[in-house]
Amino acid sequence: MLALTTPPLTTEQAHLKIQGGYRLSGEVRISGAKNSALVLMAGALLAADTTILRAVPDLADIRRLGEILQALGVKVQRLGSEAIAIDATALNTNDPPYALVSQLRASFFAIGPLVARLGVARVPLPGGCAIGARPVELHVRGLQAMGAEVTIDHGVVTARATKLKGTRIYLDYPSVGATETLMMAATLAEGETTIENAAQEPEVVDLANFCIAMGAKIYGAGTNSITIVGVDRLHGTEYEIIPDRIEAGTFLLAAAVTRSAITLAPVIPSHLTPVVAKLAEMGAKIEFPDPTRVCFTPAQRYRATDIETLPYPGFPTDMQALMMTLLAISEGNSLVSETVFENRFGHVAELNRMGADIRVKGNHAAIRGVPHLSGAPVTGTDLRATAALVVAGLAAHGETHVYGLQHLDRGYWQIEAKLQGLGAQLERYVPSAVPSPVL
């Protein structure tokens, strides 16, 4: 069984207390990618065998998905702090617990492997961060094109297919979730499936490489056209997840706003290209002394720039809030355009509480740089917004209290310890001695 460790206490009153204005220095270790770990855990369901995943961060979302898989008859076991063994031999079609599924959008990834391997899947519509609709229509249409009968009733998606059939699927939008779901389903389908306008994110490539290690035949991952030739069965494997490009970007921004020189490892340089390009444009110096390490040297003054979020290889939406923190204290006027998700400017009001000058109209945010931010009590509304407020607190004059840690704990493993190791002055404050429930 999955060894569920008690997560940090995160009641609504719990918060990070940050003393701003301290320079960072040293090297920080980047964890495995949360977004890869979640989909690869679902991908392990494709094999009636045991799979070992390495570089899996011990996060709340990982623990939730582990419990969901256990409800489906899967044996999930932690092997130390960074590896998980998944034995999907006894996979069944039980309904996953809604209390868990409602908190985790990644739970929907199970629908592809379930219908491909067992012929039926019943998965409640998912939850997660409240940053937009993020609908599942593309997943549903793709499964229907492969011959599945799909119904949505009382909030539960049911998919049935005696045997999925390979086909040509065009995605109206290069959705990462739809690409991953359909790619997993196609690995065990009869014949050849081609996904056009596919997502090109590194996490999609990681999933493809993982499935290939299990015996799948997948070609073109990382381009906008992916071809999958179905096989009869897949086998277990041992696989190491890619480093988390968003965590790496978070630490680059922490260094930038505090005007600090730090080193990050391990990283995959090509995954950081959009963020590194913008930081260099603003005046920072970024070097890659070897293929797994990045060194950041700050600018004395940062120049304003414009940001438009786009699917990979464009600027990642998950870095938008973090980059806005730096733009808020840069010289000049900047414009941020959010084209991937609606409702993703929840951090703006909180940054303005700290002295930023940001105005939002529709999916655009106009930023007038100010000399500095000031510490204040602020609350994160989603995972990346909360991370952005932590980064803002590191740069602010005075003391910042960041609330909403339940969001932060979903996506950053040991972030306080890592920042403290670089010299940041922060601590988690919990006013109550009563622990939150074990996830």
From Swiss-Prot:
One of its GO terms (cellular component) is cytoplasm. Keywords: Cell cycle, Cell division, Cell shape, Cell wall biogenesis/degradation, Cytoplasm, Peptidoglycan synthesis, Pyruvate, Transferase. It catalyses: phosphoenolpyruvate + UDP-N-acetyl-alpha-D-glucosamine = UDP-N-acetyl-3-O-(1-carboxyvinyl)-alpha-D-glucosamine + phosphate. The keyword DNA-binding does not apply. One of its GO terms (molecular function) is UDP-N-acetylglucosamine 1-carboxyvinyltransferase activity. The active site is at C129 (proton donor). It comes from the Bacteria. InterPro entries: Enolpyruvate_Tfrase_dom (IPR001986), Enolpyruvate_Tfrase_sf (IPR036968), MurA_subfamily (IPR050068), RNA3'P_cycl/enolpyr_Trfase_a/b (IPR013792), UDP_GlcNAc_COvinyl_MurA (IPR005750). Pfam families: EPSP_synthase. UDP-N-acetyl-alpha-D-glucosamine binds at R105, R134, P135, V136, E137, L138, D318, V340. Its EC number is 2.5.1.7. It is an enzyme of class 2 (transferase). It is found in: Cytoplasm. Cell wall formation. Adds enolpyruvyl to UDP-N-acetylglucosamine. Belongs to the EPSP synthase family. MurA subfamily. This is UDP-N-acetylglucosamine 1-carboxyvinyltransferase. The gene is murA.
